[in-house]
Amino acid sequence: MEEDGGVSRNDQYRQLIADVRTAYQSGQRELKWCDECQEVNLWNYWQGHGHLDARIMLVGQDWGCPWDAGAAAVMRNIQAMNCGQSVSYICENENPTDRNLIELFHSIGFDILTDDSRLFFTNFVMGYRVKGTSGNFKKSWAMADAEYFRRLVEIIRPRILLCLGKDTLKSVLGCFDSTVSNKVSYNCVIESEKNPVVVSLSDGVPVYVFALAHCGVMGTLNRNRGSGDKLSLNRQKNDWAKVLPVFWSDPLLLNTYWEPSIKMLREIEASEEKRSWCKAYSVYAPQTDKQGLIRTFRQFMNDTYKNGVVIGNYREMMNRLNLDDQQVVKAESAWVDTLSLYGAVACLAYHFRRDHFCEGSLINDSVANGCVLRLMERIYKLLVAMP
């Protein structure tokens, strides 16, 4: 674990929890501390416990009231987790915001029903309402916790901050001496080319701050204003898709996923024996594992899906970009070199998702003919060129 001035990141985090708890127990705060919370925020129990190297931090406004009847199921889960029981935060939790979050994260390749060390969930305001779960948010609550939130970001050092709602965005940007215009609607802020806003940690490392709609009922209604489907998440899924290029271009992911994957594909390309094995592979016939290729392919496929590279809306993207199926199937070098980032990603997803099962070849035939390598190299080239 990285250290700052000789103090471990874990020790910094534990000291932050102690300082926040002391501030709320001082009696000078309108909001209260929740004694069941052994983390900096109750949302950490969903994604965040031990995730001090998380790359994506989800930021809400405030958690609400843990003593409210609607929070009873979650609080039982948290109490069980404090006792060392293997219980999910989301168990028996039918909160519409949380259920929508599951769907939105799934749309970018994350399964938040399981523990994911890349994610850290928190609220900007770290205290708790005595009653009521939403509405009547006070700027003074955020101002009181701004110092603590900035410390949290400096400890975790995420690449991406996902801000749910305008008040959350304004609070987060305020910690970094940045602002958001009050002259335009929040929907315009979300859709702006200036989203995300890039801020810097104290050592100059960039953090990408995304404006997103709150995915509760009211936030979803506001995001869908002017559309016929008031509770659809489609607009929000399009908003969330903008997060992926920033996530994919993370230097950590470049080193641990993109570069090793491309190296593996180049080794196959250079070996006639390995290419022949890929061409002959079938899930319906016994195969001798050639130099661990079966294991290598499984890991490659798992990592590609896990990192959200196999986008679900690839067909919609192909149609939008007028990409011809035959050209996508061949993925010839000269053509691939003309593709935009989203075009190349859509083509790669096509090769992963199209029906290989009639011949049982899975992705292997697209690897054998070099299509996957050419597309991966194109994506990598565009990612490293991102500002």
Pin down the residues of each PLM region.
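Short, charge/polar-rich alpha-helical segments
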Residues: 326-342
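Heptad-repeat amphipathic alpha-helical coiled-coil interaction surface used
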Residues: 262, 341, 345-349, 355, ...
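Alpha-helix N-cap and loop-to-helix initiation/capping positions
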Residues: 137-141, 227-235, 366-370
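A hydrophobic alpha-helix/topogenic segment detector
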Residues: 179-254, 261
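Short terminal alpha-helical segments
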Residues: 253-310, 371-374
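Charged, low-complexity interaction regions
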Residues: 273-287, 309-311, 335-337, 352-367, ...
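Repeat-associated, polar segments at repeat-unit boundaries in modular proteins
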Residues: 307-310, 314-325, 370-383
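A polyanion-binding, active-site-adjacent surface
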Residues: 2-180, 207, 212-227
